[in-house]
A protein has these predicted regions:
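N-terminal glycine-rich phosphate/pyrophosphate-binding loop and immediately adjacent elements
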Residues: 1-105, 109, 114-118, 122-125
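Conserved redox-cofactor binding core of oxidoreductases
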Residues: 49, 65, 92-95, 104-184
């Protein structure tokens, strides 16, 4: 039994089912109709700050519960529905950098992770294959990663204008990895 089939729950469910185990995932909330998500509506900012807020204390939908964050410097980013908080990240799927695991050593903040990027790298690659991450391998701003199964999401008009501007200025840009199957 797995409570929550978002990114982590789905990965655990896949690994257990692959080993021959029967798996049941339970969700708090229902399916979200992608056509009702307000990103392409004129009043999207209103929805993002009310019924689609990442903070359940603001959202207050029937499936939500309050989270006491008064002693925390951060507010929760969570969503109670099938897919969990992945609903908020729009399938944008960047990887950590090796330096993200050493923030105490490099920047003097927080704590270093007890593991390194390179120890996790094979699991990053396996997860990318399971999820079907679309993109192009070879971005020099990131460590080497496995080839992507499908091509990146095509650039829209705004992205094309930005890419031309970046090229003109000699700035680096790269199509983002996305957890979306771009090939039927």
């Amino acid at each position: 039994l797995i409570i929550g089939g978002g990114t982590s729950g789905a990965a655990v469910a896949w690994s257990l089912a692959s080993a021959g185990m029967d798996v049941l995932c339970l969700e708090q909330g229902s399916w979200i109709d992608p056509w009702t998500y307000p990103t392409d509506q004129d009043d999207w900012e209103l929805h993002y700050n009310t019924d689609y807020s990442p903070d359940p204390n603001v959202r207050k939908l029937p499936v939500d519960y309050p989270v006491n964050d008064e002693d925390s410097p951060i507010s929760p980013l969570m969503y109670n529905a099938v897919g969990g908080s992945t609903i908020h990240w729009s399938a944008h799927f960047p990887r950590f950098h090796p330096s993200d695991f050493r923030v105490r050593s490099l920047d003097g903040v927080a704590d270093d992770w007890p593991i390194t990027y390179h120890e996790l790298e094979p699991f990053f690659d396996m997860n990318d294959r399971i999820m079907g991450v679309a993109g192009i391998a070879g971005d020099p701003a990131y460590p080497k990663k496995a080839d992507r199964q499908t091509p990146p999401i095509p650039l829209g008009k705004t992205g094309q204008v930005m890419a031309r501007g970046f090229d003109k200025l000699g700035w680096h840009w790269w199509p983002a990895d996305s957890a979306i199957n771009t090939v039927e």
